[in-house]
UniProtKB/Swiss-Prot annotation:
It comes from Macruronus magellanicus (Patagonian grenadier). This is Parvalbumin beta 2. GO terms for cellular component: cytoplasm. InterPro entries: EF-hand-dom_pair, EF_Hand_1_Ca_BS, EF_hand_dom, Parvalbumin. In muscle, parvalbumin is thought to be involved in relaxation after contraction. It binds two calcium ions. Residues 38-73, 77-108 form the EF-hand domain. Ca(2+) 2 binds at D90, D92, D94, A96, E101. SUPFAM superfamilies: EF-hand. Ca(2+) 1 binds at D51, D53, S55, F57, E59, E62. The lineage of its organism: Eukaryota, Metazoa, Chordata, Craniata, Vertebrata. Belongs to the parvalbumin family. Is regarded as an important allergen. On the 2D-gel the determined pI of this protein is: 4.05, its MW is: 11.35 kDa. Disulfide bonds: none annotated.
């Protein structure tokens, strides 16, 4: 899904680091997967991969399945992880993460 943007080995390593339930940390994940060091254009491409329904926003149900965008068969985020991730990214309080909010979250 992230061919040409992220290395498979980086995706696998980032997933291994948050295998246990409630161990997901978006800052550590974005750093490990290599997204934090990417250009604004590449981060935008990543956003559109994660925005499964192409609504222009990443909603809670898409966040829950966030890890599966990086490696097929990865675990779903727990409710607590999903809510914390949404809260961190949703700076305008509309219940979803827009592309600019996502970029800010990746670079946080």
């Amino acid at each position: 899904a992230f061919a040409g943007i992220l290395a498979d080995a980086d995706c696998a390593a980032a997933l291994k680091a948050c295998e246990a339930a409630d161990s997901f940390n978006y800052k550590a994940f974005f750093a490990k997967v290599g997204l934090a060091s990417k250009s604004a254009e590449e981060i935008k491409k990543a956003f559109f991969v994660i925005d499964q329904d192409k609504s222009g926003f990443i909603e809670e149900d898409e966040l829950k399945l966030f890890l599966q965008n990086f490696v097929a068969g990865a675990r779903a985020l727990t409710d607590a992880e999903t809510k914390a991730f949404l809260k961190a990214g949703d700076s305008d309080g509309d219940g979803a993460i827009g592309v600019d909010e996502f970029a800010a979250l990746v670079k946080a």
